[in-house]
Design a protein with these regions (language model features):
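A conserved segment at the C-terminal end of the G1
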Residues: 146-157
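Conserved glycine(s) of the Walker
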Residues: 142-144
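A noncatalytic interaction/capping subdomain that flanks phosphate/NTP-handling catalytic cores
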Residues: 1-140, 153-154, 165-333
């Protein structure tokens, strides 16, 4: 590690403290309390692999091309306790940012640390009134973001847009990551964008409609603080209703808990990296103290509690106008 490295400290609701020299979670969790010993240290850059490796008993290390511009090395240690992840990759050396595979590994390690502390991510949006939360579940491009934003403009508080952070007891914690914004969000929600942002959004939206080009152009994103406002972001609430969105003729119906659990597990784990990560599976092979099945069971318990204690609904609507139905049902339930 280099002397003078600029470190970022994160505190995820007092459950997980991270120290990293690269951005690993959204800015909402940035903390100035650097005195606390971190649960997870992440360092991306050059390091003395052999020297550091000697310090740990429980570890997994991979080294490719020890010399040259394309050299790559990773060391992961202490995954069942205080954890350190060190990585040096060509993408960071050349572009100063982690590549796709390394980003996936970082996210997977963070997910393990959260599950160990009784939390997990669910691919969903969440809003709340007082301490009662509505979880909005749907595949991508169905209307979760639009529904959450419109409900926020109707007096609800915002908790999350794409990935909800949920714990035991159906507690959902704020996770206001940057929002993907499309023209429909601007038009329907009345979002006020400056000229530069409006042009950028329109250009990105058009480019991503072209086959193959979309693979090279990122979606237009805005901070949740810009879109929603800090005062309208709640810290936590309890999930009391889950709404499964579907496109179709307007309809609201209750859902059986068994079917709801299957749906929640199917769509709720989208954009997840944990149990399919080959590096972590190999780590578990060499370090049996990391019990993957036990982690999956802990996560499963959180999912089961969500459907056992809440009201469950299928909501269908055309043109993504789900928010009126969700609002009406949630106020009654």
């Amino acid at each position: 590690m280099r002397i003078g490295t600029r470190w970022l400290s994160y505190d995820i609701h007092g459950k997980l403290r991270i120290k990293s020299n690269v951005v690993v979670v959204n800015q909402y969790f940035l903390s100035s309390e650097a005195r606390e010993v971190p649960d997870l240290v992440i360092y991306v850059g050059d390091f003395d692999h052999d020297r550091i490796q000697e310090l740990f008993d429980e570890k997994l290390s991979v080294v490719y091309r020890r010399g040259g511009v394309l050299r790559s090395k990773v060391l992961l240690a202490g995954l069942t306790g205080r954890t350190i992840l060190l990585a040096s990759t060509p993408s960071y050396r050349l572009l100063r940012k982690p590549g796709k595979r390394l980003r996936a590994l970082i996210k997977a390690v963070i997910q393990i640390k959260l599950i160990q502390r009784g939390l997990t991510y669910v691919h969903s949006a969440c809003v709340c009134r007082d301490s009662s939360a509505a979880m909005i579940v749907a595949p991508p491009e169905t209307g979760k973001t639009l529904t959450a934003l419109m409900l926020t403009r109707s007096g609800y508080k915002f908790l999350s847009d794409d990935m909800s952070l949920v714990g035991l007891g159906r507690v959902v914690y704020s996770n206001p990551s940057p929002l993907t914004i499309h023209p429909i969000h601007v038009e329907t929600c009345g979002l006020k964008l400056g000229l530069a942002k409006r042009v950028e959004m329109s250009l990105r939206h058009k480019l991503r409609s072209i086959p193959y080009v979309l693979l090279t152009v990122d979606e237009f994103r805005m901070s949740a603080f810009e879109v929603v406002g800090e005062r309208d972001i709640a810290e936590r609430a309890r999930v009391d209703a889950i709404f499964f969105l579907e496109e179709g003729k307007e309809y609201v119906g209750e859902l059986d808990p068994e079917e709801a659990l299957k749906r929640l597990k199917a769509v709720g784990k989208m954009h997840r990296y944990l149990f399919e990560n080959e590096f972590l599976q190999t780590y578990a092979y060499y370090n049996p103290a990391l019990d993957i099945d036990s982690l999956a069971a802990r996560e499963g318990k959180i999912y089961e509690e969500l459907v056992e204690g809440t009201r469950l609904f299928v909501v269908r609507s055309e043109k993504r106008k789900f928010w009126r139905l969700v609002d009406s049902v949630f106020r009654r339930s």
